[in-house]
Amino acid sequence: MAEEHNHNHEEENIIWITNEEGKEEAYEILFDFDSEDFDKSYVLYFPAGKGEDEEIEILASSYIQDEEGKQGQLKPVETDEEWDMIEEILATFLADEDEE
């Protein structure tokens, strides 16, 4: 995963992540949510520019937002329990999307 992460809500749900080579890559935010159980905020995102018919890899990170709410730092998901919770929320989100 990239060493430095920027989380910016101002660019229409796009975040820019600096990869290992120092290049910035755009990712589109699928959704974000807060967990009271883990006392963290999470964001689910995927590479920007993918078509609706393309299979995409959805990534997840926890994040700490700055005081202004404009940027923040992405952090890795640390435990299996967090992953289980994220997968359950994602499954619910995708099921709701299919119903629409």
Swiss-Prot record:
This is UPF0473 protein lmo1501. PANTHER family: UPF0473 PROTEIN CBO2561/CLC_2432, UPF0473 PROTEIN CBO2561_CLC_2432. The lineage of its organism: Bacteria, Bacillati, Bacillota, Bacilli, Bacillales. Coiled coil: none annotated. Belongs to the UPF0473 family. InterPro entries: UPF0473.
